[in-house]
């Protein structure tokens, strides 16, 4: 068995789950090897690593983290210089709601062909219930002046929803939500972790997180 050298993150640039994992790794200043995956042509090395065959997937020396929130928690347990984990327990309830009801409604709005029995307009209304809740909480972030793991976990999905129909989204009376999202999209952290890299192939020179995002 080859000697373990460095944690390896399998990722896909636009995937909101992968985005939030990369954000946490960036904030934690964790140096991992990053491998961009083409989802329609998954390498066998990735499938051998990831039990679910989904991104993100982080290979550690003794285990594999196959859930984005687990990757976030692991990274911030190693190093949390901006206290992202410092938030009320309710923050994890919001993440669960985002990953549950909101994501289901988002998918049925964004991908109507995949869900022919779902009405995209009604699905958008269902998703909006969660966004209204966030609108009433934000000040300017979910728990005050400082970002938390909840902000980083939820924002990529709000971004994905907004991009379904940006004209409609920006017409809504979501003053706090729109400011929150726009600030996120304009942040150096977000733009760093959205840097494009080529698809990983066996034999490639390792692309390190520190070289790509932490410089």
Predicted regions and their residues:
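GST-like domain detector, emphasizing the conserved glutathione-binding G-site
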Residues: 1-142
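Short helix-capping/linker segments at secondary-structure and domain boundaries
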Residues: 29-31, 116, 161-169
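Structural helix-adjacent loops and short alpha-helical linkers that scaffold large soluble proteins
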Residues: 81-84, 168-172
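Catalytic cores of nucleotide-enabled group-transfer and carboxylate-activating enzymes in metabolic
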Residues: 84, 132-135, 155-163, 185
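Surface-exposed helix-capping loop/turn segments at secondary-structure junctions
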Residues: 136-145, 189-194
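GST superfamily/GST-like fold recognition
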Residues: 144-167
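A contiguous, mid-protein "functional segment" used to position or interact
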Residues: 171-199
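Acidic/histidine-enriched, glycine/proline-rich intrinsically disordered or flexible terminal extensions
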Residues: 197-215
